[in-house]
Curated annotation (Swiss-Prot):
HAMAP family: TruB_bact (MF_01080). It is an enzyme of class 5 (isomerase). Keywords: Isomerase, tRNA processing. It catalyses: uridine(55) in tRNA = pseudouridine(55) in tRNA. Transmembrane segments: none annotated. GO terms for biological process: mRNA pseudouridine synthesis; tRNA pseudouridine synthesis. The keyword tRNA processing applies. PANTHER family: PSEUDOURIDYLATE SYNTHASE TRUB1, TRNA-PSEUDOURIDINE SYNTHASE. This is tRNA pseudouridine synthase B. It comes from Photobacterium profundum (strain SS9). The active site is at 47 (nucleophile). Responsible for synthesis of pseudouridine from uracil-55 in the psi GC loop of transfer RNAs. Belongs to the pseudouridine synthase TruB family. Type 1 subfamily. Its EC number is 5.4.99.25.
């Protein structure tokens, strides 16, 4: 007999403002406990040093978390020139100190070289896996693992402030871009070394930063609910964004109620005004535009289901 999953079966996305000094997974577990959720997962780890937007998906939304993992990110970073560390941030040990002889013009010319699509070699102090273990575990043991470079795209990188040995920048980049690595590479270009002292993620996909909430705010709502003798979910759940917010960038394919039933049973259906073959679409049903999953336009110009909502299948 299958063991019953502990927690509430809730669906949706919460935009957490991750605090510094804690891992993304520890943050996830705290949020999961506050909501008493059955199932939850985050959508792209932030370094312990980093703060900012960490979308956490609950229940059915976890099926679509890959779209947030693959989406563009935005960051605000402050780098310190003159010191290089083994982790490329201030959590590591200083391994080299050099004199800083940099003017603003030189700095802006070097920053400009990061714009566009380039190859980046991930840091050893990253969560990328090698033989089932994250690279940072090998790094802590003094083991260097060969890493292949990966294509990244920096859509924009702007210098906001240059004071003394501090450089503040704003970066809009593709998934898999390591800001620590950009900072370390910038320091080497400038000939003085550099490392990250502050990093804040200010955007994931098109989610607005004003929707983020802190752990303290969530805990306060839970405590308030308990004090008032009501279910914590009554105060917490209104903060959840809808499940389909994770796939908001996909074009919509609106099908009839009958078509929706067919989709939920694994059958492709016809719909009007569809994009070209091979395009992933967000499937909605009827005039209410109720989200039921994602599909792909097949060779017959029909909407073929790829991933659908289990709770909608139960209703179909």
């Amino acid at each position: 007999m299958a063991r019953r999953r502990k927690g509430r079966p809730i669906d949706g996305v919460i935009l957490l403002d991750k605090p510094t000094g804690i891992t993304s997974n520890d943050t996830l577990q705290k949020v999961k406990r506050i909501f008493f959720a059955q199932k939850a997962g985050h959508t792209g780890a932030l370094d312990p040093l980093a703060t900012g937007m960490l979308p956490i998906c609950f229940g059915e939304a976890t099926k679509f978390s890959q779209f947030l993992l693959d989406s563009d990110k935005r960051y605000r970073v402050i780098a310190k020139l003159g010191e290089r560390t083994n982790t490329s941030d201030s959590d590591g040990e200083v391994v080299e100190t050099r004199e800083v002889k940099v003017d603003r013009g030189q700095l802006e010319r070097c920053i400009a070289k990061f714009r566009g699509t380039t190859d980046q070699i991930p840091s050893m102090f990253s969560a990328l896996k090698y033989q089932g273990r994250p690279l940072y575990e090998y790094a802590r043991e003094g083991i260097e693992i060969p890493r292949e470079s990966r294509k990244i795209t920096v859509h924009s990188i702007e210098l906001l402030r240059f004071e003394g040995h501090e450089v503040e920048m704003e970066v809009h980049c593709s998934k898999g871009t390591y800001i620590r690595t950009i900072t370390d590479d910038l320091g080497e270009m400038l000939g003085c070394g550099a490392h990250v002292v502050y990093l804040r993620r200010t955007g994931v996909s098109d989610y607005p930063m004003e929707n983020v909430v802190t752990l303290e705010q969530l805990q306060a709502l839970r405590d308030q609910a308990i004090e008032q003798g009501i279910e914590p979910g009554e105060l917490l759940d209104p903060l959840l964004l809808p499940t389909d917010s994770a796939v908001q960038d996909l074009p919509e394919a609106n099908v009839t109620v009958e078509g929706g039933d067919a989709i939920l049973h694994g059958q492709p259906v016809k719909a009007s005004q569809l994009p070209e073959q091979g395009t992933l679409v967000r499937i909605t049903v009827g005039e209410q535009r109720d989200f039921i999953g994602i599909g792909e336009i097949d060779q017959n110009n029909m909407v073929a289901p790829k991933r659908v909502m289990a709770n909608k299948q139960d209703e179909a």
